[in-house]
Amino acid sequence: MSAILSADDLNDFISPGVACIKPVESLPQKESQSENPYEVTKEDKVQPENLPPAQISLTDCLACSGCVTSAEAVLISLQSHTEVLNTLDSYPELPLGSTSYQRGTQKVGSADSDGRIFVASVSPQVRASLAATYGITEREAKYMIDQFLMGPHGLRAGGKHGNGFTWVVDTNVMREAVLALTADEVTSSLLSTGSGSLPKSPILSSACPGWICYAEKTHPFILPHLSRLKSPQALSGTFLKSVLSKALGVPPSQIWHLAIMPCFDKKLEASREELTDIAWASTFTQSQTTPVRDVDCVITTRELLTLATARGLSLPNLPLKPLPASCLTPFPDQALESFLFSKSSSGQTVESGTSGGYLHHVLQIFQARNPGSKIVTQRGRNADVVEYVLMSSGDEPLFRAARYYGFRNIQNLVRKLKPARVSRLPGAKPQAVSSSANRRQPMSRNAAPAGTGADYAYVEVMACPGGCTNGGGQIRIEDAREAVPNALKETSTETPVAAPKPTPHEQRAWLARVDEAYYSADSDSEGSVTTEPVSVLSRDNQIHEFLNYWSEKVDIPLSRLAYTSYREVESDVGKTKNAPNETARVVELAGKIGGGW
């Protein structure tokens, strides 16, 4: 697969394959059978049928295996800034800021109401991209987003209803929850003897939707290895809709959740059937008609700029300071609010990487449980492949793990994990497909032996080279030049007028600038209050207390709130189809225009 890639293909999405399940061309209209069967009709008399334009919904793309991901055009047309504006103008905002509103006691809506509660979640990679673009700190980028989504000078300054977002949360909080649960999952897998509810070793991270879509459609033997945990985006959606629905007495359908992410494939994730209220809601509160998504819409960092432009707003002109208390609405539960909007959320270090630090956290947990142990790092064939071995005080390997970023490296990992080829000859031994690859693996004198894939306990897998700060939806250097011509003087020596296409060196420098903003989130945190460092095990205990409190508050088991499932997507290309059933299936899919259910 990698042999046919070109420079134009090195982005976050792959255009639709030729085996798409929706027709995009119309055949000539058939003449009525009542006419003379012997009549000769000239070709120019045959008029094409006047059919409506073919549309491919995001749900259709997920039901098809002709491609790895959907096209950028499909993604933007279904989940974009236009959908955000249309939704804000279509529904009035439920009033939560009135004097009669009290925490957890005032019911603000009903199933018959047309109002909506608008909430948003923002990825730290988005803030880093904005910070690099406008030459501000990551904290100031947070203020900019809050002012735009919630403040009086942002979205609330226009539109039919003057709507804005009631709460904007940082996905870092739910990322920490996923990190704690990931360490539990890896520990249970190592101690398990093959429980059906646990993934097989090695456990592969599942937070990257591009990687998940690739595995489901091309390598189903990988699915038993995938972590069952939801991503921070999905867990944020489940948290917001379950808590607000319970506390405010509104159905999940009246809570509209927008996620701002660095990646186009996050739109795919939001459209999964497994990530709706049916997966977690109780019998008495779940939707009676159609499932409600945990994340209603996903836009990328670049689309956030487009959203501001569509409303005639300039993001850098917004106040780079916190919103006044009069513009903030208290969260229904004070205990959850103190955790959700806590300023002590852990930031990122260079060692943890740019994609959430899943592997780094697991290594820290196991190192804390084994005093005197040390982590030995060995770089792979490129910077996006790194192997880790936790060595005991007696230099015995305790734990092996790895990081694989980018589809080229992912394919090498998949080949390592591919089951042994069973010979058809009687008495022949099965041959592992990765033996030759292992012989070619370079060895360092002081490093631990390289892993074969199967001996890893955990692997952090991300589709984008360089990780999530390099997501396909991030602001590119050419976009930043147009947005702020003077903000990139140190990155580009050219004048902002008619600037040439960025060179690879300039693109690497730009990505390094985004990474720097991402890693500096802790150093520019608001205020000068210093807190005592919390050990990784103590922080894990705090996270588990929060998760247990959430589960008890909504009266739903944590297993239904935080975990999900995956399924093989089979190709029907070239198979004999039952015409009536196939027609019904296509008609059903065609009715799901706009990514609906």
Swiss-Prot record:
UniProt keyword list: 4Fe-4S, Iron, Iron-sulfur, Metal-binding, Oxidoreductase
Cited SUPFAM superfamilies: Fe-only hydrogenase
Residue numbers binding [4Fe-4S] cluster 2: 208, 263, 464, 468
InterPro entries (alphabetical): Cytosolic_Fe-S_CAF, Fe_hydrogenase, Fe_hydrogenase_lsu_C
Residues the record lists as binding [4Fe-4S] cluster 1: 20, 61, 64, 67
GO cellular component terms, A-Z: cytosolic [4Fe-4S] assembly targeting complex
Region (Disordered): 25-46, 424-449
A GO BP entry: iron-sulfur cluster assembly
Function per UniProt: Component of the cytosolic Fe/S protein assembly machinery. Required for maturation of extramitochondrial Fe/S proteins. May play a role in the transfer of pre-assembled Fe/S clusters to target apoproteins.
Biased composition (Polar residues): 432-444
Species in which this protein is naturally found: Aspergillus fumigatus (strain ATCC MYA-4609 / CBS 101355 / FGSC A1100 / Af293)
PANTHER family cross-referenced by the UniProt entry: NITRATE, FORMATE, IRON DEHYDROGENASE
Entry's family note: Belongs to the NARF family.
Coiled-coil ranges (or none): none
The name this protein goes by in its record: Cytosolic Fe-S cluster assembly factor nar1
One GO MF term: 4 iron, 4 sulfur cluster binding
